Design a protein with these regions (language model features):
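Hydrophobic/aromatic-rich alpha-helical bundle segments in the mid-to-C-terminal region
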Residues: 116-117, 121, 136-183
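Hydrophobic alpha-helical connector segments
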Residues: 53, 64-100, 147-150, 172
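Amphipathic alpha-helical packing segments from all-alpha helical-bundle domains
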Residues: 63, 94-104, 111-138
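Helix-turn-helix
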Residues: 7, 11-53
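Anionic, Ser/Thr-rich low-complexity intrinsically disordered regions
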Residues: 1, 16-19, 36-39, 66, ...
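Short alpha-helical scaffolding segments that buttress acidic/His motifs in well-ordered protein cores
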Residues: 88-89, 103, 107, 150-157
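Secondary-structure edge/capping motif, primarily at the C-terminal ends of alpha-helices
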Residues: 73, 110, 161-165
Length: 184
């Protein structure tokens, strides 16, 4: 039962991220998930419940992503950190493109549904906590503030790549330059 719910939520993220909020319907999710008609509505009785489920599911997936990224040894210099962050951003705008677009769509949804902000903020805080430790390890005088600046840059770079895709997308020079400026 839990696996079917996860299958529905994965499909809903794909629909939201690939086709936009207007296409996030029970029928579209059922079709994308390859499940019988009515399955999504059995788990989520209305659109608000589906969106709430999407936020929770997205946070779980992103938590696992950050655990994978931070599982190894902490970067020992700016170059290593730039490489790690670049890999993450390329993944977010490549294989995980729909999920990243869905995250932005859910953030926009929070302008109409402020109650979503707390959960979305928890996800951002988890990323900030991990990044802050890396930046502290590299000698940042204000690691939390520097991490917030880095995450804002990554959001902007991801948003640009999602909305105006460049075939030659190479975020590393910008990331490396930003980190050098912060950690200088």
């Amino acid at each position: 039962m839990a696996r079917r719910r996860e299958q529905v939520l994965d499909a809903a993220l794909e629909v939201l991220g690939s086709e936009g909020a207007r296409r996030l319907t029970y029928q579209a999710v059922d079709t994308a998930a390859g499940v019988p008609s009515g399955t999504t509505s059995n788990y989520f009785r209305n659109r608000a419940a589906l969106v709430d489920g999407l936020v929770d599911h997205l946070l779980t997936l992103e938590h696992h992503d950050w655990e994978r990224v931070t599982a190894g040894a902490a970067p020992t210099d700016v170059g290593e950190l730039a490489d790690e962050v670049t890999r993450f951003l390329r993944h977010a705008t490549g294989p995980a493109r729909a999920r990243t677009a869905a995250r932005f769509a859910l953030r926009l949804e929070s302008t109409a549904r402020p109650e979503l902000r707390a959960a979305l903020a928890r996800g951002r805080e988890a990323a900030t906590a991990r990044g802050t430790e890396w930046l502290r390890h590299l000698g940042s005088a204000t690691p939390r503030r520097h991490c917030e600046i880095l995450l804002d840059h990554l959001d902007g770079a991801a948003f640009r790549q999602l909305t105006f895709p460049a075939d030659d997308f190479d975020p590393r020079p910008g990331i490396h330059g930003l980190l050098n400026g912060l950690l200088g």
